[in-house]
Amino acid sequence: MGLTGTNTTLVAPQPKGILDPRTGKPVGSDDAFFNDLNGELSDKGFIVTSADALITWARTGSLMWMTFGLACCAVEMMHISMPRYDAERFGIAPRASPRQSDVMIVAGTLTNKMAPALRKVYDQMPEPRYVISMGSCANGGGYYHYSYSVVRGCDRVVPVDIYVPGCPPTAEALLYGILLLQKKIRRTGTIER
């Protein structure tokens, strides 16, 4: 038992991961970031990186989103958690508490009475926090733009990072918006200089 008496080097087996049925390669094998990481790890046995790059990589791989479904767009927001789209494979998962969330997805018509509650939930989220505006009602009021009780875009209440157009937008459009947010997080620095 243990490592005594072994003459071979201890090497972890090649990770198999989830294979893409179309190409037969592991999912994410064409990602330049991971190819550089794997090349450096197999060459040296360790990785040299900046803390900024490591923090950014961790943030993009573990986005927890706050569900703020206000109207029919919320149904499409639920679809990305189902098996067909499986948003968790991209490192995103819904959370019920704003204190555990990184992203707020505003899906639907924001009314004047709901605006203070939206802002309160946004203020309870820890930094860095991001907002995705989903659907034409959240983006600019939609069909109810001229109603006295509708806020003409949630960007009047909270700062919005990604706009997903459509009425309602498809689950693919929301998934694309989340991937754009991950790309935006990778581009921005984490440490203020």
UniProtKB/Swiss-Prot annotation:
Gene3D superfamilies reported in the protein's UniProt record: 3.40.50.12280
Coiled-coil segments: none
GO CC terms in record: plasma membrane; respiratory chain complex I
Cofactor: [4Fe-4S] cluster
Cofactor note: Binds 1 [4Fe-4S] cluster.
E.C. no: 7.1.1.-
Family according to the record: Belongs to the complex I 20 kDa subunit family.
Name the UniProt record assigns to this protein: NADH-quinone oxidoreductase subunit B
Species of the source: Brucella canis (strain ATCC 23365 / NCTC 10854 / RM-666)
